[in-house]
Amino acid sequence: MKTITVFKGDGIGPEITDAVISILKAAHAPLTYEIFNVGAAEYERNGALIPNDAFVSFEKTHLLLKSPITTPIGKGFRSLNVTLRNKYNLYANIRPAKSNDAVKTPFPNVDIVTFRENTEDLYVGIETQIDRNTVHATKIITRTASERIIRDAFIYARKKKRHKVTCVHKANILKLSDGLFLSIFKEIAKEFPDIESDDKIVDNVCMQLVMHPENFDIMVTPNLYGDIISDLTSGLIGGLGLLPSMNIGTDYAMFEAVHGSAPDIAGMHIANP
């Protein structure tokens, strides 16, 4: 039996967590669970987003199943997702979007996996208020982080017998930061001659995804673009509720739904787990 850590989260988080655990038990998954209340509600009750016991559990099990957590917009505490990704070096956010015959959409042949770098870019959250009318945000792209996410995308492609990896970037404008990411992509692509590779500017990718999603296989991208385009791919298959998300590091892994905490329907038991 494998023990996993479970975070119940906010809004619909507790009720869908209970439903998922019921499903896993009915399927006789060889798992035991250490369950914790975390998030904004826990912060209001006890002054901590995550109880220390929850950190201890994750550091022991190395495997986390997390439900949605509310993040204040424009104020308040930092995103708990970002905190967990950085604390445990969960550098690869992998989001597969695949058409489901049970859900009718205009796009029946979608099968796209997005590899999103998870620890840097604008999501490092380094913002400086120069004066009341000016704010600077720092975008960080490093060779180390770029190499590992790009190489992981190609290794996955080879292992899963996929055909193409596309680098998504904005190097036409961000010539140094995205330019570095793109140049590293081209270097690593040479190590995988059996896998087709190409690169596309992010705005063009958004247009092409809603016109010809069947032309995409695996996408690898810096943090911000990956967050946006993976949500777009969820729309192609029927919505965020159908898109799983894996946050993978060298030693730890976190699995979660992509959608939010939906406080407006919390407790109504109408959210599909």
Model-identified regions with their sequence ranges:
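Glycine-rich phosphate/diphosphate-binding loop of Rossmann-like nucleotide-binding domains
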Residues: 4-26, 131-203, 215
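Short, acidic/small-residue loops that bind anionic groups at enzyme active sites
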Residues: 86-99, 191-200, 242-257, 266
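Glycine-rich phosphate/nucleotide-binding loop
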Residues: 40-42, 209-273
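Solvent-exposed alpha-helices and their adjacent loops that cap or buttress functional pockets
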Residues: 56-58, 104-108, 158-159, 189-190, ...
